[in-house]
Amino acid sequence: MNIGLILSGGGFRGVAHIGAIKALEENNIFPTHISGSSAGAVVGAFYAANYSPEEILAFFKTIPIFNLGRYAHNKAGFIDTDKYYPDFKKYFPEDNFDALQKKLFITTVDLNHGEIKVFNKGELIKPLLASSAFPGLFSPVTIEDGLYADGGILDNFPVEPLKLICNQIIGVYVDPISEVESMNLKHSLAILERAIKINFLSDSSKKFSECDLLIYPYHLNKYGLFDKNNIDEIYEIGYKVTQEKIKENKLQFYTK
């Protein structure tokens, strides 16, 4: 039986995916197919390569984001996404989907043609970097003759790759929204992030019904897109909410 796992984008809120995976495994639920966008693609790739939740969490704690040595020069972005290649190469030395232990689908956006592009074979790291290349902040990634960027632009909850091949689907959405006061929307970045989250949720919520189990850690709404200071809290929220949802859900998942 194939169990699919959808991992949404959400910046450092994506660390909640790691806690969710930990809870799933503790309940003997082991997804066989993973579809991820942006931060979800990164977590999904590590999980597909059989890294433990603890190892994935350690990666997120140590990866530098706003580092002077990674600023872009003559590229469309403040940070040069390609400079993260060596960081990922350490964990994915074969740099190929075929080396993974689980089936993985990475959602990106083809900027040249203005459409979704899902990668599931061939080189791994460049699609992974592209899926996480938040527009304007991180430079897009060149793959062959095209430019690719954050998959969340068009699909922040990529269920389509799993619909026809999985018997059961688990979805984890880590980009929730809640009502905010106007005083918290005084800066350009806050307005931009708010607008993006509203758009993402509007599109993603239409797909929630495709999931046999939906994990929606609502309390993540108080954490920012690049909130690296609260990684342990974010992880725990993902873990606890998943444990609660599994107990509530009556569906029997295939277990090892």
What are these regions (language model features)?
Residues 1-37, 45-256:
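Patatin-like phospholipase
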